[in-house]
Curated annotation (Swiss-Prot):
Entry superkingdom: Bacteria
Name of the gene this protein is made from: folE
Protein name as catalogued: GTP cyclohydrolase 1
Organism: Streptomyces coelicolor (strain ATCC BAA-471 / A3(2) / M145)
InterPro entries: GTP-CH-I_C/QueF, GTP-CH-I_N, GTP_CycHdrlase_I, GTP_CycHdrlase_I_CS, GTP_CycHdrlase_I_dom
Reaction(s) catalysed by this chain's protein: GTP + H2O = 7,8-dihydroneopterin 3'-triphosphate + formate + H(+)
Alphabetized PROSITE patterns for the sequence: GTP_CYCLOHYDROL_1_1, GTP_CYCLOHYDROL_1_2
Pathway(s) annotated for this protein in UniProt: Cofactor biosynthesis; 7,8-dihydroneopterin triphosphate biosynthesis; 7,8-dihydroneopterin triphosphate from GTP: step 1/1
GO annotations of cellular component type: cytoplasm
Family (UniProt): Belongs to the GTP cyclohydrolase I family.
GO molecular function: GTP binding; GTP cyclohydrolase I activity; zinc ion binding
Ligand binding (Zn(2+)): 90, 93, 163
Record carries keyword Ribosomal protein: no
An annotated GO BP: tetrahydrofolate biosynthetic process
Length: 201
């Protein structure tokens, strides 16, 4: 992780402490009035700790880990992968948000591209951590620009947030859209072309 922060001398952000996570879940169950030793909840702290290790796996990955393989194919037209499933966790309430991401880029003048599946893996790197959708969108776009050095990038993310659906305003089905454009895709005509491809069904 970049710039790790020490927590009272007990570890650094970026280190997963499974036992500590179990204890925290147990304390949370007690705090809401449950009995963590009753049948049905006895193994819940361990299960939740293991689930969090998977759900937040992106904390222990870097974008370079998934974008290391590139190909110089001389391709200079837009590459776009649509409808990449997004599963993430709102950092404000620690409840899920889910939806899709559309990720496109115009390769560098050398024609350097990456595998299509790598774009989906890049989305996962940033989605599998405590997150907000706005930052998620920006991080995907900035990583592509930095690592692939394309002439342009567009990222559009559309998600439903459980923190709006199951609590608070309670509006299930409401979708949030965020976008980030970089380089040549800031050009109106090029951006419109990309958006028409994204919106086409």
């Amino acid at each position: 992780m970049t710039d790790p922060v020490t927590l009272d001398g007990e570890g650094q952000i970026g280190e997963f402490d499974e036992k500590r996570a179990e204890n925290a879940v147990r304390e949370l169950l007690i705090a809401v009035g449950e009995d963590p030793d009753r049948e049905g909840l006895r193994e819940t702290p361990a299960r939740v700790a293991r689930a969090y290790r998977e759900i937040f796996a992106g904390l222990w990955q870097e974008p370079e880990d998934v974008l290391t393989t590139t190909f110089d194919l001389g391709h200079d037209e837009m590459v776009l992968v649509k409808d990449i499933e997004v599963f993430s966790t709102c950092e404000h309430h620690l409840v899920p948000f889910r939806g899709v991401a559309h990720v496109g880029y115009i390769p560098s003048t050398s024609g350097k591209i990456t595998g299509l599946s790598k774009l989906a893996r890049l989305v996962d790197v940033y989605a599998r951590r405590p997150q907000v959708q706005e930052r998620l969108t920006t991080q995907i776009a900035d990583s592509l620009m930095e690592i692939l050095e394309p002439r342009g990038v567009i990222v559009v993310v559309e998600c439903e947030h459980m923190c709006m659906s199951m609590r608070g305003i309670r509006k299930p089905g409401a979708k949030t859209l965020t976008s980030a454009v970089r380089g040549q895709l800031r050009d109106v005509a090029t951006r419109n072309e990309a958006m028409s491809l994204i919106m086409a069904r």
